[in-house]
């Protein structure tokens, strides 16, 4: 049982108003940060990436599906894996409901993994997701965006989340954003990794409102409790 200070309604309201002022300050700071994110310079994508999709091979530009903006989630599912990463699966449970709303704002959404397409399709059917999920197998895409690494590099130093660190797996999570101009030229505008993906997990935002919060302090690692939703 949680032990907590108990006060009158009037005292609670006073403290809640004080916290509300901080919450509003945080919201304004987040809005400013989002504006700065949009002002980042872009990098032209020159490499001709090709993906295996249920509709055949498609280029990166073709994944935009008529939109000018593309969100890519880099899902940890490598060649030969029997199932996808539990943490990526936790995050992916939030995708299907958001996609129609993203489409209304000129945004296409696709999940990319390095596993061959039949392996992706098998896991997708098992879980029951509907979002578009394509394979970058045989291309440099995952490696160029620092979410896949040669097996020999696992346990040694590599670049992930814009720093040099020990690589713990040959597949890592991330999200990358792209823009396509009217001429069809594609630009990379943003990528985030690790805790940078935290804001995308709606369930975490709900947990942050509860008395126990995420309740992960005593776990071996923060997401040790996470299970795929069919388990």
PLM regions with names:
Residues 1-70, 75-105, 122-128, 132, ...:
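Non-globular targeting/processing and membrane-anchoring segments
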Residues 73-74, 109-115, 120, 136:
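Short His-Asn-centered micro-motif
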């Amino acid at each position: 049982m949680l032990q907590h200070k108990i006060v009158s309604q009037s005292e609670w309201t006073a403290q809640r108003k004080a916290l509300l002022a901080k919450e509003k300050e945080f919201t304004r700071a987040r809005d400013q940060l989002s504006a700065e994110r949009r002002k980042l310079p872009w990098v032209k994508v020159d490499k001709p990436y090709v993906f295996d999709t249920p509709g055949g091979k498609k280029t990166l530009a073709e994944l935009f599906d008529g939109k000018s903006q593309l969100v890519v989630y880099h899902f940890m599912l490598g060649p030969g894996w029997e199932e996808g990463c539990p943490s990526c699966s936790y995050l992916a449970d939030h995708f299907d409901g958001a996609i129609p709303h993203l489409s209304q704002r000129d945004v296409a959404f696709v999940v990319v993994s390095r596993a061959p397409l039949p392996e992706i399709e098998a896991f997708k059917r098992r879980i029951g997701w509907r979002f578009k999920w394509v394979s970058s197998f045989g291309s440099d895409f995952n490696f160029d965006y620092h979410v896949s690494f040669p097996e020999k590099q696992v346990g040694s130093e590599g670049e992930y989340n814009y720093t040099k660190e020990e690589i713990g797996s040959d597949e890592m999570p991330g999200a990358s954003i792209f823009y396509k101009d009217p001429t069809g030229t594609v630009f990379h505008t943003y990528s985030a990794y690790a805790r940078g993906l935290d804001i995308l997990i709606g369930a975490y935002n709900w947990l942050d409102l509860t008395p126990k919060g995420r309740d992960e302090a005593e776990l071996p690692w923060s997401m040790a409790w996470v299970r795929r939703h069919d388990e």
